[in-house]
Structure formats: structure tokens, C-alpha cells
A protein has these predicted regions:
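Helical segment within the ABC ATPase nucleotide-binding domain
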Residues: 173-186
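Hydrophobic anchor residue at the start of the ABC signature
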Residues: 148
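A short, proline-enriched helix->beta-strand linker immediately N-terminal to the Walker B motif
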Residues: 153-157
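Conserved ABC ATPase signature
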Residues: 134-138
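Conserved ABC ATPase "signature" region
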Residues: 101, 105, 112-130
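Conserved ABC transporter NBD signature motif
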Residues: 61-69, 76-77
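Catalytic Walker B motif of ABC-type/P-loop ATPase nucleotide-binding domains
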Residues: 159-162
Length: 202
């Protein structure tokens, strides 16, 4: 077992039409690291995160998550991952608590165990008072929190986030950043994209 949570070797991504988003990048992230991919729009950050999270198909190259080659055993790799993309990934008409509870069930967490886990997660993210609200009524910042709750409910070893604080006001951004640092301090490796230099420098 290596010391790395993520190993990328010569990763390339070319989209239909010939747009080359990634031109052979290589990267290693150690277990327990908090790693930020910094760059302007169009730099390939979202493509990289999407490929790591198995949401985007790579053109070539190798991706290993805790030594698991995603080409050979993507199912096991997914169990180790929590993914927060930029796009909303839940029904806007479902209740907040139901969205996270359903996600727990997807990972095989028994209802008796899931119930207190969901309550704890929603409280930590400031969503407990909104647990019976439909997701469509939430602000953009709270929808982002809900996506993080979904991604963390199965306690992944690696959390990846694509612009988690984009479009969020300064106060909420600070709260989310503090929460992510707390998660990292408890042992979860975190990789995120950002175009905020001050965040990357933390």
C-alpha cells in the first residue's frame, strides 16, 4: 500500500470537436492532504475533477485511488470517493432529509444507522432546520451544502469538490472552508478546484 490517496499519470482529455482540455498531466496527492487545483476558467480543473470522480471519461492515462486503478475496479474506487460537482445532482422537489437518507441507502447503510448519521451531518452543515424543506427552496449556498452532505454521508476516504464556494457569499464561504478543514483534520483527503488564490494559499 502506497502513501498516496491519488496518483495520476499522463492524463489526457480531448472532447468532441478537438478541444484538448488535459495534455498529459501527472499528479500525486498524499493521504490526508488538502490539495487545491488553482486556475482560471478553461484551465482543465473541472475535467480533472470529473475524471477523478469517474464522472468524465478520460482519453488516455492512468488514475489510481488508494492504489486502485479506476480502469480495472471502478466500483471499489467509487466507494472510497465523495464527489461534489458544480451541477446539482438531486431532485429539486425532494425534501432535504430524504435526499441524504436516500444517498445513505445507496451505499448500503442500514436505516437504523443512517438516521442518526443523517441528523448529525445535516446539523454540522447547518441544514437541520431545513430538513423538511424541498431542495428547490434552498439558496445556492445551501444547495451546495446539501451536495456536500450527500458526498460525505458514507464517510469517503477521498472528497473531491469542483468550485465548492463558487457563487457563495463571503461569510458562507468562510464557514464552508472551515468545515472542510475540519473534515480534513479528521483524516479525509480533500482535493478541490478554486479560482480564489487566497483559498488555495490556505
Amino acid at each position: 500500500m502506497s502513501e498516496f490517496a491519488l496518483q495520476i499519470d499522463n492524463l489526457r482529455k480531448t472532447y468532441k470537436g478537438g478541444t484538448e482540455a488535459l495534455k498529459g498531466i501527472s499528479l500525486k496527492v498524499k493521504k490526508g492532504d488538502f490539495y487545491a487545483l488553482l486556475g482560471p476558467n478553461g484551465a482543465g480543473k473541472s475535467s480533472t475533477i470529473g475524471i477523478i470522480g469517474t464522472l468524465v471519461t478520460k482519453t488516455s492515462g492512468q488514475v489510481k485511488i488508494f492504489d486502485i486503478d479506476t480502469d480495472k475496479d471502478v466500483a471499489t474506487a467509487k466507494l472510497l470517493l465523495g464527489v461534489v460537482s458544480q451541477e446539482i445532482n438531486f431532485s429539486q422537489f425532494e425534501k432535504v432529509i430524504d435526499i441524504v437518507t436516500t444517498q445513505a441507502g445507496f451505499y448500503g447503510i442500514k436505516k437504523s444507522i443512517a438516521k442518526p448519521k443523517v441528523e448529525t451531518m445535516l446539523k454540522r452543515l447547518g441544514l437541520w432546520d431545513k430538513r423538511n424543506d424541498q431542495a428547490r427552496t434552498l439558496s445556492g449556498g445551501y444547495k451546495r451544502r446539501l451536495m456536500i452532505a450527500k458526498a460525505l454521508i458514507h464517510e469517503p476516504k477521498l472528497l473531491i469538490l469542483d468550485e465548492p464556494t463558487a457563487g457563495v457569499d463571503i461569510e458562507l464561504r468562510r464557514e464552508m472552508w472551515d468545515f472542510l478543514k475540519e473534515i480534513n483534520a479528521n483524516g479525509t483527503t480533500i482535493i478541490l478546484t478554486t479560482h480564489y488564490l487566497e483559498e488555495a494559499e490556505q
